[in-house]
Amino acid sequence: MKIVRVTVTPIAFRDPPLLNASGIHEAFALRSIIEIESDTGYIGLGESYGDAPALAIQQQVKDQLIGLDPFNLNHLRAIVQATVAAHKPASIAGAELAPGSHASKAVSNAYSAFEVAFLDLQAHSLNVPLVDLLGGAIRDRIPFSAYLFFKYAEHIDSPYKPDSWGEALNEVQIVAQARRMIDTYGFKSIKLKAGALDPEHEVACIKALKKAFPGVPLRIDPNGNWSLETSIRMAELLGDDLQYYEDPTPGLEGMAELHTRTGLPLATNMVVTDFDEFRRSVALDSVQIVLADHHYWGGLRDTQVLAKMCQTFGLGVSMHSNSHLGISLMAMAHVAASVPNLDYACDTHYPWQEPDEEVIKGGKLPIVDGCVKIIRAPGLGLELDPDQLGKLHDQYLSCGIRQRDDVKQMQRYQPDWKTVKPRF
């Protein structure tokens, strides 16, 4: 079996005005959709970053895959490594929120984008679900958490109508957002994206959530935007309210000091983003939970390696998310299904994406009782909707965004806004 066609299609979909440590989401999120077709007629799908630096590498890699055996992942990795070495990519804007955007992650980013499509193609050719290539499913329902954000009611100079979620800047609005998430999707845990407003106010929102949803596990994620002293002060206010404390302060050393001084379980998707950082983190006891993300950890199988290392060193495992669509979510679900030590519900932005902006046939994947169910069909169990793909590609061409920049977008609201880390 040989590869005869590789297509990389950049797309854009509407993204709400969600606040974060760097600024605010732009009106559109960018992704790439990858299709790989074999000479036997099977097609594998992948979804990855759609910013210009990532796309440039993906486009260069795809031209070298024609004639390759889709089972030869070592050859794929060698092609990606050589391409990145020759390309010397620049970092993608917004990198602090998406550690996979760092130029140093270019190999793992690009390899993952194609590895998922290769594995999907392999599984189709064998007539088995993709998870069977990862050792089989330990679970077929993957738990996710309600992912809350502070947000404005609409984008400044919005190119489309406001989303249905409305403003969320105070305790009452955040509780209402959580209630809608839980009522609609059945989530059993809650995560609040923080680092955007005054820390005491964000902690007050956690307190309001605890009162409104007693017994529901809570997490807060300031994206490293609190100083060590602020993080300690907020830890004292939070007490035992949290399931885990995610990336409150920057750096491996800062996180290690915070854990020493508070004893709270710390989680990260920012200070442990590759295996070298993992080694250093273990030596320092910086974090107790690692949020995996196959998009920048080097694919589904490297994510399994990460989970095994976490098991070896007694660390918990969860999963990180960026704005994504169904191919990414289902790939995430398949690898999560194969990981024995998935200790916590995973993150997903999926509820924030509009129902008419999915690229797979059948529309958005259902989230029921807080879980995504593995599709027991060949590969990922998904097919592209060509009309929807064309629509979102046209939106990419017209939206004017080529590289995520939450700082620049925030400056449209606050002209004096600057990158400051930690801000509080």
What are these regions (language model features)?
Residues I156, Y160, S164-I182, S231, ...:
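Short, acidic/polar
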Residues E37-S125, P415-K418, P422-F424:
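Metal- or metallocofactor-binding catalytic centers and their adjacent structured scaffolds
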Residues N109, V116-I156, H324:
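Glycine-rich, aromatic-flanked loop segments that form ligand/cofactor-binding clefts
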Residues M1-F13, D39, V305-L306, H324-F424:
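Flexible C-terminal active-site loop/helix
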Residues I142-V175, A194-A196, N223-G224, A267:
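Active-site mouth loops of central-metabolism enzymes
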Residues M1-S32:
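Short, Gly/Pro- and small/polar-rich lid/capping loops
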Residues I3, G41, F114, N127, ...:
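Conserved, mostly hydrophobic/aromatic
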Residues L192-S328:
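Catalytic core of soluble alpha/beta enzymes
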